[in-house]
């Protein structure tokens, strides 16, 4: 199976898992649950679930076990987008080519749906059937996702990002923002896949952390590039939004060509990290292909 087929299969699997975990929730057919479904299920690259599946499969973990962490990390991602789009944050009206949640369902339902998706993520990890995961590793997975989602990770990065609007931000500070805002959850996705494999996955965490940090920054650099050279129809969100908000970006700091070079260098670093795992007879091809996809994508 080539990478596009692999990726498409992952999208389908992640969507099925998300639907399965959302379907039994109470208050079906109410605006809040409809907002949750809209925010979590309509579109999206499913990059983070792919990282969970690819990392777990590399260690021989079954898809059945990986469905829970894949859905959990995507619930956190979906909640973060719903809240990021709110008027008090980035004030976006378009996401994945559709009206944002607060535009379609109102701000109150968007806030509640985001809150509910966040807590659903931890319910999934604590309660779901993961036959290959020990209690110790399940607790580690919950702790990992909590750390990546909170003030030490994604929320902290968003706070730094909001504070930096309209200011000149040096490269080191910009990377700090994105290691937290974007990188923390990408790192968590890789770690959840590894932790699902127990001790053999734990032993690989230092190498996988280097890989995840490199692709996390590369993902953001490419996002910044696409905000300059992309178009709204392809991106599914407003092109040029970062510039309108006065945000520092990699193209603004480095220039477009140097930003592209930085993204390529980061992906080279990621691939180099994986060589240590390939030398242990682990199949890293899916993670390598995902790294290349990150800087080849157009949305």
Model region roles, listed by residue range:
Residues 1-23:
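N-terminal amphipathic/basic leader segments beginning at the initiator methionine
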Residues 12, 22, 26-273, 283-295:
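Mg2+-dependent prenyl diphosphate-binding active-site environment of isoprenoid biosynthetic enzymes
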């Amino acid at each position: 199976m080539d990478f596009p087929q692999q990726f498409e299969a992952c999208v389908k699997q992640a969507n099925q898992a998300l639907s399965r975990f959302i379907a039994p929730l109470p208050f079906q057919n109410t605006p809040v649950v409809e907002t949750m479904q809209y925010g979590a299920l309509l579109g999206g690259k499913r990059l983070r679930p792919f990282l969970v599946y690819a990392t777990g499969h590399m260690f021989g973990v079954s898809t059945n076990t990986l469905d829970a962490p894949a859905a959990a990390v995507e619930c956190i991602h979906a909640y973060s987008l719903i809240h990021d789009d709110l008027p008090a944050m980035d004030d976006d009206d378009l996401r994945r080519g559709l009206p944002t949640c607060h535009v379609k369902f109102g701000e109150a339902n968007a806030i509640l749906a985001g809150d509910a998706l966040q807590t659903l993520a931890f319910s999934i990890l604590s309660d779901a059937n993961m036959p290959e995961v020990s209690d110790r590793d399940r607790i580690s997975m919950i702790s990992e996702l909590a750390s990546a989602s909170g003030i030490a990770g994604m929320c902290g990065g968003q706070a730094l990002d909001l504070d930096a609007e309209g200011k000149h931000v040096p490269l080191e500070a910009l990377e700090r923002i994105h290691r937290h805002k974007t990188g923390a959850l990408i790192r968590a996705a890789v770690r959840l896949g590894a932790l699902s494999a127990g001790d053999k996955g734990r032993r690989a965490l230092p190498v996988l952390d280097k890989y995840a940090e490199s692709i996390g920054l590369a993902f953001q650099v490419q996002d910044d590039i696409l905000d300059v050279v992309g178009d709204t129809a392809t991106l599914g969100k407003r092109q040029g939004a970062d510039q309108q908000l006065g945000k520092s970006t990699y193209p603004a700091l480095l220039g477009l060509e140097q930003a592209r070079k930085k993204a390529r260098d980061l992906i080279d670093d990621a691939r180099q990290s994986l060589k240590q795992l390939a030398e242990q007879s682990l199949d890293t091809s899916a993670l390598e292909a995902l790294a290349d996809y990150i800087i080849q994508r157009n949305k």
